[in-house]
């Protein structure tokens, strides 16, 4: 695909059509992008990737963040009104696979103090890892985690693993077409940066709402 395939106006048009074709629901639908790749051998580990992309206009909705910590980091989290999981609570959660799964599903991101990471890996790794939700690690002496929290509120995590397609939430239907298009561009640029032959390995790009049909970004 040529650079013109990602012309901003073409993305805006696809977003506009995806929103128009979405039936009204009694909730605010998310807007997602799907990027189909080609000529990539996913049996080779070096071709797989995980990415964190900061969306210029944020996700358009609240992001649930939990902090696994004691001491200074826990206090910093409480000042920001975040949910805190202490090391003692972590031990209790470890005894119940059901609780661990529920925890992994409930939150979008986790922040954890470094000394607890061995326990987190042992107790929660099997639940957080496959969901691409392993914690952002901070030192136990950190007293201000607000910059990290603010960044996470605008961040999406995406990964290329077994199938040659990358999915990413890019906002909600209440955001403007231009804001969503800029967020999509940020995701596309991040993916292109990880591909050996860049945009030439992108087969197609689709935009859709949660319950609506997929609309192709025309090249």
From Swiss-Prot:
A biological process from GO: regulation of translation
Entries under CDD domains matching the protein: Ribosomal_L1
SUPFAM superfamilies on file: Ribosomal protein L1
InterPro entries registered for this protein in UniProt: Ribosomal_uL1 (IPR002143), Ribosomal_uL1-like (IPR023674), Ribosomal_uL1/biogenesis (IPR028364), Ribosomal_uL1_3-a/b-sand (IPR016095), Ribosomal_uL1_arc (IPR023669), Ribosomal_uL1_CS (IPR023673)
GO cellular component assignments: large ribosomal subunit
UniProt xrefs under Pfam families: Ribosomal_L1
Keywords: Repressor, Ribonucleoprotein, Ribosomal protein, RNA-binding, rRNA-binding, Translation regulation, tRNA-binding
Gene Ontology MF terms: rRNA binding; structural constituent of ribosome; tRNA binding
Function noted in UniProt: Binds directly to 23S rRNA. Probably involved in E site tRNA release.
Subunit structure as annotated in this protein's UniProt entry: Part of the 50S ribosomal subunit.
Family: Belongs to the universal ribosomal protein uL1 family.
Protein name, entry field: Large ribosomal subunit protein uL1
